[in-house]
Design a protein with these regions (language model features):
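Conserved HGGG/HGGXW glycine-rich cap/lid loop of the alpha/beta-hydrolase fold
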Residues: 36, 41-86
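Short beta-strand/loop motif that positions the catalytic acidic residue
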Residues: 241, 247-249
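Catalytic active-site module of serine/aspartate enzymes centered on a nucleophile-bearing elbow/loop
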Residues: 270-301
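Short alpha-helix in the alpha/beta-hydrolase fold that links the catalytic acid
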Residues: 234-235, 243, 258-265
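Active-site loop/oxyanion-hole signature of alpha/beta-hydrolase fold enzymes
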Residues: 33, 78-123, 294
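Acidic catalytic loop of the alpha/beta-hydrolase fold
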Residues: 228, 252-256, 282-283
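Flexible "cap/lid" loop of the alpha/beta hydrolase fold
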Residues: 133, 142-175
């Protein structure tokens, strides 16, 4: 699909009818001002929990991972982050983790969720922490899974950042999407699971075409471009975070260094608890959903 000229990531609705991709979870939509939307799927019953995915993903990542186990205890609302999946955001706006937290909060309010637990993975975990710093009195707690917490040069800056440039970015995206992306993106998706392997269920049922289309990669580039200033702001504010926070990290994560991010953040955030999952990689919510559920249950109100 070509890059959308004015909004990201692309189509405003999943395809319906016989041609619909069966891997795409049916969405509902919250309409926000300025032609923004938050797409979401809901399952389970109990206290409210909002699940936020990470980079190169859409809500199916959470849906295929910890959501089924969480739904036994919570009403889970899994969202497409702004500019990802089927959630629309204006081109060049709203990529900052703080802006994304605000947009998700707008959707939470419109849905009438009651003091939800905010659960995020990777980039989504950074959004969950920002959400807690912005709106501490509105949530029950934070579950931060494999969080990226501090500014650093990351692979996303190099691979995707240039595609978000206002001059030449769209052309570069089209060229790379047709040439290198078909080989590059599967390598990245598989590497996320190391040292484990991608589960067969994920391989068969995750909508890779949705998460890897050109417009979403442009959104990834915008996200990466705002990561340094946004995480600098976060790092300065972690000591003021006054929401019950559970940080979980994989002991063998090669995507986000657990010891430079989650471990340090847990020391800075008052009262935060840290759990290291031995031998687990970045995608441990898929291989160890029980630790995610345990952390969420500890915040249940």
């Amino acid at each position: 699909l070509p890059v959308a000229a004015h909004s990201l990531p692309g189509p405003a609705r999943p395809t319906s009818g016989e041609q619909a991709d069966p891997r795409i979870v049916p969405r509902r939509f919250v309409q926000l001002p300025d032609e923004r939307t938050i797409a979401y799927a809901q399952t389970g019953s109990g206290p409210d929990l909002v699940a936020i995915h990470g980079t190169l993903m859409c809500l199916e990542d959470q849906w295929l991972g910890p959501v089924p186990a969480l739904a036994e205890h919570f009403r889970v609302v899994a969202v497409d982050r702004p500019g990802h999946g089927f959630s629309l955001r204006p081109r060049g706006c709203g990529a900052d983790i703080w802006d994304q937290a605000t947009q998700i909060r707008e959707a939470v309010q419109k849905l009438g969720l009651n003091r939800p637990i905010i659960l995020g993975h990777s980039f989504g975990a950074a959004i969950a922490l920002a959400y807690g710093m912005l709106y501490p009195d509105e949530i029950a707690g934070i579950v931060s899974l494999a969080p990226v917490c501090f500014p650093e040069l990351r692979l996303e800056h190099l691979l995707f950042g240039p595609r978000a440039l206002p001059l030449g970015g769209d052309l570069l995206t089209r060229i790379l999407h047709a040439s290198s992306d078909p080989a590059l993106l599967p390598l990245l998706w598989n590497a996320m699971f190391l040292p484990q392997t991608m589960p067969q269920q994920f391989r068969q049922h995750f909508p890779f075409e949705l998460a890897g289309r050109a417009a979403q990669i442009t959104a990834e580039g915008e996200d990466a471009g705002w990561l340094w200033p946004a995480l600098t702001r976060s790092a300065l504010r972690y000591p003021s975070l006054r929401v019950p926070t559970r940080i979980l990290c994989g002991g063998a994560d090669i995507v986000v260094n657990s010891y430079l991010h989650g471990v340090v953040a847990a020391r800075l955030i008052p009262g935060a608890s840290l759990e290291m999952v031995p031998g687990a990689g970045h995608m441990f919510p898929h291989s160890h959903p029980e630790v995610v559920v345990r952390a969420a249950l500890s915040l249940k109100h």
